[in-house]
Amino acid sequence: MDFRIGQGYDVHQLVEGRPLIIGGVTIPYERGLLGHSDADVLLHAITDALFGAAALGDIGRHFSDTDAAFKGADSRVLLRACAERVKAAGFTIQNVDSTVIAQAPKLAPHIDGMRANIAADLGLPLERVNVKAKTNEKLGYLGRGEGIEAQAAALLVKQGG
């Protein structure tokens, strides 16, 4: 079997006046993530991991932050489009593992919803999608609550490989 592993990363600044959307879940908080789209840091990291595993570039190549068509875009729509492109390139998505690093708010109550959204968007059973939440132990810009970061890994299998 031809296995492919991809790694994804994203970070966005926290600002007032924007909703906080992570993993397709709107989380009650006084600030949200700044970005061209809905700035869903988790879905962007997963999208990058999938594109990377398939050697299809990155999220910016497919959904440019300078393209008005993606202004305010729902990152779940982008993730579904990514999955379609990965499948069209002859790959099957096996699993996704991810970590969100945020000093606040607490994300644990929202992880089940995030996992369900990601599994649905990728057409995977829930047990093949994992989301972890960590703080940065008050260190650096993440620890000061200036932004939220996400990291992801994805495993693909090339069909006929």
Swiss-Prot record:
A divalent metal cation binds at D10, H12, H44. Its EC number is 4.6.1.12. Pathway: Isoprenoid biosynthesis; isopentenyl diphosphate biosynthesis via DXP pathway; isopentenyl diphosphate from 1-deoxy-D-xylulose 5-phosphate: step 4/6. Its cofactor is a divalent metal cation. Binds 1 divalent metal cation per subunit. The record marks H36, T135 as: Transition state stabilizer. The keyword Magnesium does not apply. Keywords: Isoprene biosynthesis, Lyase, Metal-binding. One of its GO terms (biological process) is terpenoid biosynthetic process. It catalyses: 4-CDP-2-C-methyl-D-erythritol 2-phosphate = 2-C-methyl-D-erythritol 2,4-cyclic diphosphate + CMP. It comes from the Bacteria. GO terms for molecular function: 2-C-methyl-D-erythritol 2,4-cyclodiphosphate synthase activity; metal ion binding. 4-CDP-2-C-methyl-D-erythritol 2-phosphate binds at residues 10-12, 36-37, 40-48, 58-60, 63-67, 102-108, 133-137, 144. Homotrimer. PANTHER family: 2-C-METHYL-D-ERYTHRITOL 2,4-CYCLODIPHOSPHATE SYNTHASE, CHLOROPLASTIC (PTHR43181:SF1). NCBIfam families: ispF (TIGR00151). Involved in the biosynthesis of isopentenyl diphosphate (IPP) and dimethylallyl diphosphate (DMAPP), two major building blocks of isoprenoid compounds. Catalyzes the conversion of 4-diphosphocytidyl-2-C-methyl-D-erythritol 2-phosphate (CDP-ME2P) to 2-C-methyl-D-erythritol 2,4-cyclodiphosphate (ME-CPP) with a corresponding release of cytidine 5-monophosphate (CMP). Belongs to the IspF family. This is 2-C-methyl-D-erythritol 2,4-cyclodiphosphate synthase. It comes from Burkholderia cenocepacia (strain ATCC BAA-245 / DSM 16553 / LMG 16656 / NCTC 13227 / J2315 / CF5610). The gene is ispF.
